[in-house]
Swiss-Prot record:
Keyword Nucleotide-binding: yes
SUPFAM superfamilies: Actin-like ATPase domain (SSF53067), Heat shock protein 70kD (HSP70), C-terminal subdomain (SSF100934), Heat shock protein 70kD (HSP70), peptide-binding domain (SSF100920)
Species whose genome carries this gene: Methanocella arvoryzae (strain DSM 22066 / NBRC 105507 / MRE50)
Compositionally skewed regions (Acidic residues) per UniProt: 614-623
InterPro entries: ATPase_NBD, Chaperone_DnaK, Heat_shock_70_CS, HSP70_C_sf, HSP70_peptide-bd_sf, Hsp_70_fam
Protein's name in the database: Chaperone protein DnaK
Biased composition (Low complexity): 582-603
Gene: dnaK
Coiled-coil stretches noted in the UniProt entry, renumbered to this chain: none
């Protein structure tokens, strides 16, 4: 069976892993890093950049650079570039496609299957959007699993004995707090809570706002109106946040950040850990509510938690570690990389699906309650939050009016008592109900959640047997034709990228050959004939002309012709060099024979002529 790729599709960065020899191995990017920046950019010439290349040019191209798209998953948000609108699924697919290509290059084989992680608190729309992104990228998404659960898999693969663990997953854009019981290869999620709009990006925004305010106070210039300056400031804020996890102060230095009539302005500011912690305190305090909710839903107390696992870059910050220690009264685990464990766990789940990993059972839960709208705009729950998945639940409802021949099923997700306060997942109609007084028809509504946490809903009139099954069609979902179109677009992009790469390689090969030909002509002298020199010169000129056209096939043909000529010349030069070497060897042997004859006519045969005889006297030091 082909390898199953485990992917942590993150807000700021993404990671990937595969199973090798029963253990998860992190996949490096083509640039050599152990993570893929979740950044996509379009240059002014229309070229698409993904990952590190996109991040590097963000300062000079902020308006055409897309970051933190994960926060828009499951919404109707669109990015418009050059008149074309891209959904969050399409942008995410570009990131996934880059990961897929680099992983294939790393392991040397085609990858078609993946397990992708999502925040535990993602709703159905967001989960389906993530799965669609994988499909657009050319991946069969075998499973969508929760990030904290994946982290626990990576942490607990070799652990024995029963224990209750809490996973605190604070990433670039989301927070998840998950409590699970682990023992004898069974990972059972007891509860999960979180906030899909809380993460390291919010901390960065606080730092950016503070620095911009201080700069305005000092210079009167508001950097918030300058997109290029703000991108530089964002990079500096993130860097300062990371540095202050290990140092007490850092310097934020951005020369030529802006200019006014008096000339260029430079930003140079000292930022201390104490100031940083004061700035992000409001963000950190928002972490308490999900922690309390998770503990309450699991019907535990804080001191009943055996181990705490930290996941995500921001959990390296001392203020986060101290907050968790204070709340739970114990030190979090430090034995696993918080940036890599989610991807590793996803690859372990891939190993389970492929049959590589045995004796491991994952019992996850749905993070939010699911139900329908009933009379009076009431939210009636069919499946409570933290129900183990996969699961199926049915309930019988009836009509709200006399002679009602159809009913609308309004599917919702959330914890609020009124339907309009929750997230709408979709609406559909069951028609053809025989006219009858209200309350008489029997309509069975069935909710079915698969192992990915994705919902299917069915309504059936028990009197007539008529039923209507749906895949939720909320406005944020993509229909099959949209996905097929986006898959073709992604394949087209991949083909264009491959063509650009091939062109660059062909041009580089041609340049190298031209340099070699030029050097050969200069060094060859009279070792090659005038005809051979002329053929090399003509071949080089033909290749240069082909390069000017930009036609790959013409360049390849001219390169092949010149290569053939150069091979013939190289053969001649090699034979000349070989002949010269043989002549040198013969001359050296003749010289040695002549030297040996002179030694034979001397008075001391066998004596080294370089040794000089000397007299000596023994001296007694004791005299």
């Amino acid at each position: 069976m082909s390898k199953i790729l485990g992917i942590d599709l993150g807000t700021s960065n993404s990671e990937a892993a595969i199973m090798e020899g029963g253990k998860p191995v992190i996949i490096p990017s083509a640039e050599g890093a152990r993570m893929f920046p979740s950044v996509v950019a379009f240059t002014k010439t229309g070229e698409r950049l993904v990952g590190e290349a996109a991040r590097r040019q963000a300062v000079t191209n902020p308006e055409r650079t897309i970051i933190a798209i994960k926060r828009k998953m499951g919404t109707d948000y669109k990015v418009e570039i050059d008149g074309k609108k891209y959904t969050p699924q399409e942008i995410s697919a570009m990131i996934l496609q880059k990961i897929k290509q680099d992983a294939e290059a790393y392991i040397g084989e085609k990858i078609t299957k993946a397990v992708i992680t999502v925040p535990a608190y993602f709703n159905d729309n967001q989960r389906q959007a993530t799965k669609d992104a994988g499909t657009i990228a050319g991946l069969e998404v075998l499973r969508v699993i929760n990030e904290p659960t994946a982290a626990a898999l990576a942490f607990g693969l070799d652990k024995k004995g029963s224990q209750k663990i809490l996973v605190f997953d604070l990433g670039g854009g989301t927070l998840d707090v998950t409590i699970m019981e682990m023992g004898d290869g069974v990972f059972e999620v007891l509860s999960t809570s979180g906030d899909t709009q809380l993460g390291g990006t919010d901390m960065d925004n606080k730092i950016i706002d503070y620095i911009a305010s201080q700069f305005k106070k000092d210079t009167g210039i508001d950097l918030r109106n300058d997109k290029m300056a703000m991108q530089r400031l964002r990079d500096a804020a993130e860097k300062a946040k990371i540095e202050l996890s290990s140092t007490l102060q850092t310097q934020v230095n951005l020369p030529f950040i802006t200019a006014d009539a008096s000339g260029p302005k430079h930003l140079d500011m000292m930022l201390t850990r104490a100031t940083l912690e004061e700035l992000v305190r409001e963000v950190v305090e928002r972490c308490y509510a999900p922690m309390r909710q998770a503990i309450s839903d699991a019907k535990l107390t804080a001191n009943q938690i055996d181990r705490i696992i930290l996941v995500g870059g921001p959990t390296r910050m001392p203020i986060i570690i101290e907050t968790i220690k204070k709340f739970f009264g114990k030190e979090p685990e430090r034995g696993i990389d918080p940036m890599e464990c989610v991807a590793m766990g996803a690859s372990i789940q891939g190993g389970v699906l492929a049959g590589e990993v045995k004796d491991l059972l994952l019992l996850d839960v749905t993070p939010l309650s699911l139900g329908i709208e009933t009379l009076g705009n009431v939210a009636t729950r069919l499946i409570e939050r933290n129900t183990t998945i996969p699961t199926r639940k049915s309930q019988v409802f009836s009509t709200a009016a006399d002679n009602q021949t159809s009913v609308e099923i309004h599917v919702i997700q959330g914890e609020r008592p009124m339907a309009y306060d929750n997230t709408t997942l979709g609406r559909f109609h069951l028609i053809g109900i025989p006219p009858a007084p209200r309350g008489i028809p029997q309509i069975e509504v069935t909710f079915d959640i698969d192992a990915n946490g994705i919902l299917n809903v069915k309504a059936k009139d028990l009197g007539t047997g008529k039923e209507q099954a749906i895949t939720i069609t909320a406005s944020t979902k993509l229909d099959k034709s949209d996905i097929e179109r986006m898959v073709k677009d992604a394949e087209k992009f991949a083909a264009e990228d491959a063509a650009k790469k091939e062109k660059a390689e062909v041009m580089n090969q041609a340049d190298t050959l031209l340099y070699s030909a030029e050097k050969t002509l200069a060094d060859a002298g009279d070792k090659i004939t005038a005809d051979q020199k002329e053929r090399v010169t003509k071949g080089s000129d033909a290749l240069r002309e082909a390069q000017k056209t930009g036609d790959i096939e013409k360049i390849k043909a001219a390169t092949a012709d010149l290569t053939k000529t150069m091979n013939e010349v190289a053969t001649v030069l090699y034979q000349a060099a070989q002949q010269q070497y043989q002549q040198q060897q013969a001359a050296e042997q003749a010289a040695q024979q002549q030297s040996g004859g002179q030694q034979a006519s001397g008075s001391n045969p066998g004596k080294d002529p370089n040794v000089v005889d000397a007299d000596y006297e023994v001296v007694n030091d004791k005299k």
